[in-house]
Design a protein with these regions (language model features):
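Aromatic "clamp/platform" in nucleotide-sugar-dependent glycosyltransferases that forms part
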Residues: 293
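A short, active-site helix/loop in glycosyltransferases that binds the activated sugar's phosphate group
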Residues: 145-188
Length: 393
């Protein structure tokens, strides 16, 4: 089959890593795959993509006649049968694609990689509202939030109606999609989770090789990741567990603030590593702590579990329950509308930090659970999708 991935960008983000992993897997299984990206690709992501995958760069992120013509030429030259639009929002990729494929027998799939009813723009307004006590400004912010929410809802509904299949990452997002978009019976909505994108086939779990280390892996920002919560939790553990350490692997706009937070608290065993290859950290760490305000289907969860790292995750999005069974293969930290409870999270971590037998049991269960998200298993599900699309032509 001839498949094209349509990308807004092809850099080092999670969506791009998923696309690179799937594209490379499809090629290994005999498919012909090309990638078209509106903006120039990052060398690191290109390097992790199978060299048999040809990558084309369009002329910027716009639905222009030039981009439509360029994309149409790619579709025809490679006799594309299926396009996977990895940006289920916003409208530009969908509109450009539909103009480019006009008159061609091509099936389309749009994938939305986040929680259905929120995004960075909406969350920014909510953050501003938390700190605003001026009645007039609050009214303006509420109106802004309503406008952003409406635009997001209408855009999502538009893309859904102009694609053959629309994918979300969790079964729990199906009713949320209907509520958010107003589409009561979304008959071509489907659930498809992301694969583990990091190869752990050469990893042999040994409890004795695991260090007493908690890690955070990812971007350091306030809007989504809320890494300050990781530090708040660690402040309640550092003195009690002098042989444990916290390692922050990642970078971002909030890093300086988080480093200041660590200094202000007088914490001694916190290391900031910047962006690094995650595998060595997964191989040695015992626990991963993720305290995001919202997510879609975080790649780091299944990834860390495949290396026997126990995930401790704030239950701020419904997909958490798809991945983790609390107390068996991970820890689900309860969500509270009034805010993250660091003391409660610390108590839950405390229970396994001091219990080696429990940690080993949970690590082994996590490894077993991660197999549900192996690349080959997810590939098999994609094959069924392709078959269904083409046989229902």
């Amino acid at each position: 089959m001839n498949i094209l991935f349509l990308m807004k960008v092809y850099d080092v983000g999670g969506i791009e890593v998923v696309a690179a992993t799937l594209a490379s897997c499809f090629v290994r299984h005999g498919h012909q795959v090309v990638i078209a990206t509106f903006n120039p690709p990052e060398d690191l992501t290109v390097a992790r993509t199978d060299p048999r995958v040809k990558i084309y760069t369009l002329d910027g992120y716009v639905c222009s006649s030039k981009n439509v013509a360029s994309l149409r030429k790619i579709l025809i030259e490679h006799n594309i049968q299926v396009v996977i639009n990895q940006w289920g929002l916003p409208l530009v990729p969908c509109r450009t694609l539909n103009k480019a494929k006009r008159g061609l027998n091509i099936k389309t799939i749009a994938v939305y990689h986040n929680q259905i009813d929120t995004n960075a723009r909406i969350k920014d307004v909510e953050i501003a509202l938390e700190d605003c006590h001026n009645p007039l400004k609050r009214c303006l912010l509420e109106a802004k939030k309503a406008a952003f929410t409406m635009v997001t809802s209408k855009s999502m509904a538009y893309v859904y109606r102009h694609t053959d299949l629309y994918q979300v990452l969790s079964p729990s997002y199906v009713p949320l999609f209907s509520k958010f978009t107003g589409i009561k019976h979304p008959d071509h909505l489907m659930v498809q989770t992301n694969p583990v994108t990091l190869d752990s086939s050469d990893f042999d779990y040994s409890f004795d090789k695991k260090q007493k280390e908690i890690i955070y892996m990812g971007r350091i920002d306030y809007n989504q990741k809320r890494v300050y919560r990781v530090i708040d939790t660690w402040t309640k553990l550092e003195q009690k567990f002098p042989d444990w350490k916290l390692t922050i692997v990642g970078d971002g706009v909030e890093r300086a603030n988080i480093e200041k937070q660590v200094a202000d608290y007088g914490l001694k065993r916190v290391s900031f590593e910047g962006f690094k290859q995650p595998k060595p950290y997964y191989e040695r760490a015992s626990i991963l702590l993720l305290t995001s305000e919202y997510e879609g289907f975080p790649l780091v969860l299944a990834e860390c579990m495949s290396f026997g790292v126990i995930p401790a995750v704030y239950n701020s999005y419904s997909a958490v329950g798809d991945i983790i069974t609390d107390g068996k293969d991970g820890i689900v930290i309860p969500y509270h509308k009034e805010g993250y409870a660091a003391a409660e999270a610390a108590d839950m971590l405390d229970a396994i930090m001091k219990d080696e037998n429990k940690r080993e049991q949970m690590a082994l269960a996590a490894i077993e659970k991660s197999k549900e998200y192996s690349v080959e298993k997810i590939y098999g599900e994609w094959e069924k999708v392709f078959h269904s699309l083409l046989t229902n032509n």
